[in-house]
């Protein structure tokens, strides 16, 4: 059994390792509210496209 088969072989059904950004597959800084499942960097990029507006 090689190293490649051992790496990331543990099942991830819950927790931070089981979720990723739908745009870039990043696992850090994930915004899950309202079912967005998008990281904070991608949210800043796509916020207007999604329908969020910046208030003054």
Curated annotation (Swiss-Prot):
An individual GO BP term: cytoplasmic translation
Cofactors that this protein relies on: Zn(2+)
Domain of life: Eukaryota
Localisation per UniProt entry: Cytoplasm, Cytosol; Cytoplasm; Rough endoplasmic reticulum
Binding note for cofactor: Binds 1 zinc ion per subunit.
Keyword annotations from UniProtKB, A to Z: Cytoplasm, Endoplasmic reticulum, Metal-binding, Ribonucleoprotein, Ribosomal protein, Zinc
Binding site for Zn(2+): 21, 24, 39, 42
Record's signal peptide: none
Keyword Metal-binding: yes
GO molecular-function terms, A-Z: structural constituent of ribosome; zinc ion binding
Residue stretches in coiled coil: none
Pfam families for the chain: Ribosomal_S14
Entry GO CC: cytosolic ribosome; cytosolic small ribosomal subunit; ribosome; rough endoplasmic reticulum
Annotated TM spans: none
Principal place of residence: cytoplasm
Quaternary context: Component of the 40S small ribosomal subunit.
NCBIfam families xrefs: PRK05766.1
Family note: Belongs to the universal ribosomal protein uS14 family.
Protein name: Small ribosomal subunit protein uS14
Classification lineage: Eukaryota, Metazoa, Ecdysozoa, Arthropoda, Hexapoda
